[in-house]
Regions:
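Short active-site neighborhood of thiol/selenol oxidoreductases, capturing the structured segment around
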Residues: 51-62
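N-terminal "domain-start" segment that seeds a small globular fold
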Residues: 25-44
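Thiol-based oxidoreductase modules, predominantly thioredoxin-like and allied folds used
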Residues: 79-101
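Structural alpha/beta surface segment adjacent to cysteine/selenocysteine redox centers
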Residues: 98-115
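Typically the conserved alpha-helix immediately C-terminal to a functionally engaged Cys/Sec
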Residues: 67-82
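Non-catalytic, surface beta->alpha helical segment in thiol-disulfide oxidoreductase systems
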Residues: 113-158
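N-terminal secretory signal peptides that target proteins for export/translocation
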Residues: 1-6
Length: 159
């Protein structure tokens, strides 16, 4: 009897622990449903100009697993330091490919190739890079080093 109760308690504890871990694995709310992306970009450009940085536009959606992976890679070192030192990051919610499509068009980001999709702007707003071939839409098959390489390639030259 004691063994049965013990096994039951261990199994119950494992189920509770597993349920708790699953709750933490939920997608983060990276892309705001209420943000004004036009305003966010303008504010990012103003900050980039003051701090001599570039702006990264990250087009995606909270439903997108690859977008979640990109965000994880953005928060790993050395990527987090590179972002903080050289870039202002703007997350732009594309909804189900029905939001902010005007911005994707303006910055020449073909959302039909998939998300996440990135664009890099100078502090003056000049388009320096736009993702053309869905390079980051398969983030789950890439690693953090590919993000590091991208950030190093597009960080501003030393002044």
């Amino acid at each position: 009897m004691y063994t049965l109760v013990r096994k039951t308690l261990v199994a119950l504890f494992a189920v509770i622990l597993f349920a708790g871990l699953c709750g933490h694995a939920q997608a983060r709310n990276i892309y705001s449903d209420t943000a004004d992306a036009h305003k966010d970009i303008q504010q990012a450009l103003e900050l980039a100009k003051r701090e001599h940085k570039r702006v990264i536009l990250d087009f995606g959606g909270n439903w997108c697993g690859d977008c979640q992976v990109l965000d994880i890679y953005f928060h790993q070192q050395p990527n987090l330091d590179l972002l903080n030192k050289y870039f202002v990051l703007v997350h732009i919610n594309v909804g189900r490919f029905d939001k902010n499509t005007d911005l994707a068009e303006k910055y020449q980001v073909p959302l039909k190739k998939g998300v996440p999709a990135l664009a890099v702007l100078s502090a003056s707003g000049k388009l320096l890079y736009s993702q053309k071939n869905g390079e980051f839409e398969a983030m789950r098959r890439m690693d953090a080093a590919s993000v590091t390489q991208f950030l190093n390639e597009w960080k501003p030259a030393k002044v």
